[in-house]
Amino acid sequence: MGLFKSLFGGNNTPETEKEKNDKKNFEILKYDGIRAQRMGKLPYAIKCFEEAVAINDELETLSLLATAYTQANRLDDARITLDRMATKDPEQVNTFLSLAGICYMQEDYENMKDACQKALVLDNKNPLSFYLTAKAAIGMKDDITAIAMLTKAIVLKEDYTEAYQLRAEVLWKMKQAKDAAEDIQKLLSLNPDDEQALLLKGEILAATNEPEQAQECFNQVLSLNPFNEKAYILSGELYLVNKDFDK
């Protein structure tokens, strides 16, 4: 039997040994990269992940590499890696959502929208896909579509605070004060100490001739966070408008 192995199977031995070494090296590089990433040593983590995917371009390690690139603000490299993941497995919703996030950071709203649409084709019940589509629409100056997408996100996730906040901001930009105020009230019912919501509520109240209530909102923000610069600015503007110079 040894003779047959030497005659017919001998050529497999070096390859088998190489596969074992590759697997071992891959695991070492991958988990060294994870440890380095957790310690904030991004250049070393990236190097480990790059060498690991050169051995085995599995999705998990590619995802780790894309995240490390993003953390290091190497957005082009992150995008290339995510495109590579999408080509390798085009059925992964999270890949397209991550790609949409990178496009948003690069202000590439057309490709962001495209990534979101691909995510929605795979899963049209994911509220994040609609939320990111709305952000792409805002970037493209399409507020009507943004409102529609945010509404769909909220239908799917009734406590989606970020979607309520963003929809309120868009509605207020469109001078729809009543509708914006309703979203803010819903948001504050979910989180009474939401600084962004309180500031927007104050802005709306100030613009609709409710200065005292507006100031209460700004004061509440400052009591929560004395370093909130926007609260000071809005409060100062309110004083100027109402000529309350003594304060």
Residue spans of the language-model regions?
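Structural signature of alpha-solenoid helical repeat scaffolds
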Residues: 20-21, 53-54, 87, 121, ...
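Helix-start (N-cap) detector for alpha-helical repeat units in TPR-like alpha-solenoids
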Residues: 26-27, 59-60, 93-94, 127-128, ...
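Alpha-helical segment of the N-proximal tetratricopeptide repeat
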Residues: 21-60, 64-71, 101-107, 135, ...
